[in-house]
Regions:
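N-terminal ligand-binding lobe of clamshell/alpha-beta domains
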Residues: 1-303
């Protein structure tokens, strides 16, 4: 009979983790397990100290020799976009977990699942509970808006791509109404393309742009043919949220991302933002200009 006594010495949880996207890195830091991370994506920005970890990949490409050199016992990937990377790592004998979260509930589920994999599920559920409560607090604050601004969320400029599901869901939580709700289910960018003329027809009150890896050129948005007839352009309500805060399906979107969305929509409505839900990181500088419209009192904003 084979001797399996050696199995008692096998570590129960992964200790050398490579994260090929930003959201798993940030989640592991929130869990306080950052010492287990031995490799990250070059796009990682949060938290800043994570940038000191070895960089072993971009998004759709990876340095396999660098990954193998850090001797991982687990690699975390995201979606079909990293399927080729995952396949090669599996061929090389590396354990891989691929997440595929595309909505706010799925992001929360990803965080709990990752915590479970690391052996700290209770901490993960505690974090998810706090994030959920914060989003609910923002949604309650948005109930005091005089109206819900109609929002075109622009994920890319050419072709125009409307917001992915989690961004659209966070817009709703923050107090807005997406003008292309029927497209949010498109898992691929090509499934969410829109014609500029259709944006004119939907006539959003605000344009919120987040171009992945590129600074938004507001002047180019204002100068699109016929867009001078759009309410958002006429009233100067064109804003940027850095893709780091809203286009990664993880903690950043559920914290800073939704707070910046709420701050933008509050400005459009002409109301102040409660101190406890103010964005904590760099926002669009246009948000700091004097805001037109009626200012709601502190008493009106109490929830």
């Amino acid at each position: 009979m084979p001797d399996y006594t050696y199995l008692s010495d096998v570590a129960g949880y992964p200790r050398r983790i490579v994260c090929l996207t930003e959201e798993t890195t940030e989640t592991i830091y929130l869990l306080g397990e950052q010492d287990r991370i031995v490799g990250i994506s070059g796009y990682t920005a949060r938290p800043p100290e994570a940038r000191l970890k070895p960089k072993v990949s971009a998004f759709t490409t990876a340095k396999f020799e660098k990954i193998m050199a850090v001797d991982p016992d687990l690699v975390l990937t995201f979606s079909d976009l990293q399927a080729d990377i995952a396949r090669e790592l599996i061929v090389r004998g590396v354990p891989v977990i691929a997440f595929n979260q595309r909505s706010v509930p799925e992001i929360l589920e990803m965080m709990v699942t990752l915590a479970r994999v690391l052996g700290c599920e209770a901490k993960g559920r505690e974090i998810v509970g706090r994030l959920t409560a914060d989003i609910q607090r923002i949604a309650c604050s948005a109930n005091f808006f005089p109206y819900r601004p109609r929002v075109f969320f622009e994920e890319w400029k050419q072709p125009l791509i409307s917001g992915i599901r989690w961004a659209e869901e966070l817009i709703e939580a923050a107090g807005g109404e997406p003008v292309f709700p029927e497209l949010r289910g498109g898992r691929l960018a090509k499934d969410r393309t829109v014609e500029p003329a259709l944006v004119r027809e939907r006539n959003p009150d605000v344009v919120i742009a987040s171009w992945c890896g590129m600074k938004v050129n507001k002047e180019s948005i204002r100068n699109r043919p016929g867009w001078d007839r759009i309410t958002a352009v006429q009233k100067g309500h064109i804003y940027e949220i850095k893709s780091t805060y809203i286009l990664q399906p993880g903690p950043a979107a559920l914290t800073e991302g939704v707070r910046q969305l709420h701050a933008i929509l509050a400005r459009v409505c002409g109301v102040p933002v409660q101190p406890e839900i103010q964005p904590s990181e760099a926002c669009d500088p246009d948000l700091h200009k004097s805001s037109p419209g009626r200012q709601m009192s502190t008493e009106e904003l109490k929830i």
